[in-house]
């Protein structure tokens, strides 16, 4: 409650300041999209500031801020990405949001692969007609997992790699037979909301991987005052509840 009141106080101060008209620019990993859209709307209600969100993969986030340090006011990204951008974000402003695990998606009309245990998961992978994952961090983990459980060489010819989570969903939608894809849990929920794919479930907990995400103020932020208020709002119970509902876990498991 105390944190929420602090966030509201910051919003009230903004409502009476010249920065009220500023458009807040947020650069974010796609995994945060499902919750961030709602949060941006709530923040506008509280502060009056419009929030413009640009989504990108971790490599793209690095490239954008490296080439233009003033491209955004706030960034939400995987912790390793923020570490690499240490010179581009304001010191002591990084705050952890939570983690996103890996999940399986399939066509709504397709049989759901069994991912209830590691043995069942391994069997489903071996029996699949095609396996789709991205070239971003979540896809890199899935490939390492397939190698770890000893099936990569057997299924390598069935693997389809695409650029990002949206591309995974598009490929799954257009597929046939016993095909399924992998993505961040929040990405899969978002794509299920859009229609054409279904969430099968998270991968087995014993091989689950949580990518931890944090927010930070961009050092060269064009609108630092509303940006700081937005970062404060992200720590409120209201924002944390929204993130949790979108599939973000509050802490690393």
Model-derived features: positions:
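Sec/Tat signal peptide C-region and signal peptidase I cleavage site
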Residues: 17-21
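Bacterial N-terminal signal peptides
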Residues: 5-16
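Exported/periplasmic ABC-transporter solute-binding proteins
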Residues: 22-71, 76-100, 105-253
